[in-house]
Amino acid sequence: MNNPLLAIQSQYWAVRDYLSPVLRESKFKEHGRITPEEFVAAGDFLTFKFPVWQWEKGESSRARDFLPPDKQYLVTRNVPCLRRATAVDYTNADEDAEKLLSFLDDAEEAPGPDDDWVATHINRSPPHRPTDMDEIPDIPDSPTTAPTREMAGLNVSSGGKLEEDEIPDIDDIPDMDEEGLEDLEDDAAVRIVHPSEAEVNSTAGKNLLQVRTYDCIISYDKHYQTPRFWLFGYDEHKNPLTPAQVFQDVPADHAFKTMTMESFPHSGAQLASVHPCKHASVMKKFIDRMEAAQGPAPTAEPETISSTSGTSGSAGGKEEKEKKKKWGLGSMVRKVTGGSVPKVEKDKDEVVTGVPVDFYLVIFLKFIASIVPTIEVDSTTSTAL
């Protein structure tokens, strides 16, 4: 990964990000871009609803002045990665391996085109099948249930009653040390066999699931004016993953293209990052689809206007005459600028329609989950959007 071209490109992006102006006007609905204040608001909503995400301040020398000192970026740790990307690759051979599934009962009406689910990879066999496991043999029953000769020779009813003199006293039993007896050590019972390192390594990966974990980070990109996603991975022994190992968990369509190794601006470490050049356009499409699914926005109710007009209409004739005669400077300014009390009250009661900006990072995580499907990034599936 020591490519000089990538190093030059990273330096160019760092300078470009430094010289880019900070977005001050919200472009959330128009272009899918957000301001640093909106990024903090969306991060507060994410940490409140899903506490696995936490704010981090990072290194003080690398802090961004347009963000609060204690809210520089978001992080969630120990996110599991159960499979490699090759286990979920979708190739051309899998295009025909699809099937529509319907979960409606027979008593319900016929399903529509939107009521079916698509099941993919239906012809792909799993790597480990339960039927491939060897069966545990049952313990065979004893061939005979007859008592042994020793047990057959015993007769409980035959023996007389023991007398008290025949019971030995425990103090009369001689000690082993007094008799000169020595304990015999059984070599077979105390022998400990240590397996070799090769045997341990060969059996470690047979029946155990090798789980990798990742630290997922969301920062704010000043140039693209969108969030940016970062990954730092560990193996099953909590050792940091190499860049080659990280890209084993990234689909081939995105490895070294959409996702590359970049310098994390808050620490300088080399982390895998999803390039944010397309984030704004993709988020704009998601927001438009969600708002279209919610239906048309409700019209404003003219209660304030009607109540105001009713109040003004109920005034006496004397007050109306005084208002007509009264043409002061304040009245002229309010009349020209349109500033009046009913309009101010209407702005306060204005209902915000559509998707709020607080949901931005929740939608963003669902978009990232489609890029790295092997990593359990999205923990917000129970949220009703």
UniProtKB/Swiss-Prot annotation:
Ordered alphabetically, the record's keywords are: Autophagy, Cytoplasm, Protein transport, Transport, Ubl conjugation pathway
Q: Where in the cell is it found?
A: Cytoplasm
According to the UniProt entry, the note on domains is: The N-terminal region is involved in phosphatidylethanolamine-binding and is required for ATG8-PE conjugation.
* Biased composition regions of type Low complexity, renumbered to the chain: 303-312
By what name is this protein known?
Answer: Autophagy-related protein 3
Q: What is known about what this protein does?
A: E2 conjugating enzyme required for the cytoplasm to vacuole transport (Cvt) and autophagy. Required for selective autophagic degradation of the nucleus (nucleophagy) as well as for mitophagy which contributes to regulate mitochondrial quantity and quality by eliminating the mitochondria to a basal level to fulfill cellular energy requirements and preventing excess ROS production. Responsible for the E2-like covalent binding of phosphatidylethanolamine to the C-terminal Gly of ATG8.
Task: Spell out the GO cellular component terms annotated for this protein, sorted alphabetically and separated by semicolons.
Answer: cytosol; phagophore assembly site
Q: Which InterPro entries match?
A: Atg3/Atg10
Q: Does the keyword Protein biosynthesis apply?
A: no
Q: Which family does it belong to?
A: Belongs to the ATG3 family.
Record-linked Pfam families: Autophagy_act_C
Q: Which gene encodes it?
A: ATG3
Q: Write out the GO MF terms.
A: Atg8-family conjugating enzyme activity
Active site at 277 (glycyl thioester intermediate)
Where is the region Handle region? 281-359
PANTHER family given in the database record: UBIQUITIN-LIKE-CONJUGATING ENZYME ATG3
| Top-level lineage group | Eukaryota
Origin organism of this chain? Cryptococcus neoformans var. neoformans serotype D (strain JEC21 / ATCC MYA-565) (Filobasidiella neoformans)
